Amino acid sequence: MGCVTTPQQDPRPLVRAAADRARRIVENVGPDHMTAPTPCPEFDVRTLLGHLASTLERSAAVGSGGDPRTIPESLTAADDEWPALLDRSIEHYWQVWNDDALLYKPVTAPWGTFPGRIAVLVELDELIVHGWDLAVATGQEAEADPPLAEAALEVMRLALPASPRDGLPFGPPVEPAPGAGATERLANWLGRDTAPWVRRERT
């Protein structure tokens, strides 16, 4: 996978890798995990699975000129159907965002109007960070492959300033813990307090 280093470049290869990673995490979520808490206090595992699929559908709506607010914040599925639901949402996402020209066209989301590639970067964040959320909530490996996580972190630092973030769906950055991996540092940059969810070796 090539390393994307600026928000002006095509971020879709990163999104494809992040979607593949999210799919692997979802595949390993079992029925006994569904009511477990997650780092997103408004979601348990079941509703976070539904929210992850919803982010893809909402991004597809943004890219196609629709209103993402018509899509529920969290989709629903039977406990054994989450991988299939995510597959359908990923397929729908790419039906819209495979259009190269869309990266440079203005699109409108609830938080503003901007070039399409910015909407792709937002989905990259959703996939990697909510993948991290699901992984730590279900006892899976939470760190993405370093090339993916480092590239995504570099892009998001360029695309999303530390401040101001008024009107954006991100909180202020959180100071990373010493030794935090790139995926955790990405979550921190996007406002996630990861400390309660990560066990660290005492020295």
Model-derived regions: residue spans:
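Structured surface interface patches that mediate subunit assembly and partner/cofactor docking
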Residues: G2-R21, N28-P41, E57, A61-T203
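Extended, alpha-helix-rich binding/interface surfaces that flank or overlap catalytic cores
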Residues: L48
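Glycine-rich loop at the start of a catalytic domain that most often binds anionic cofactors/ligands
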Residues: H51-L52
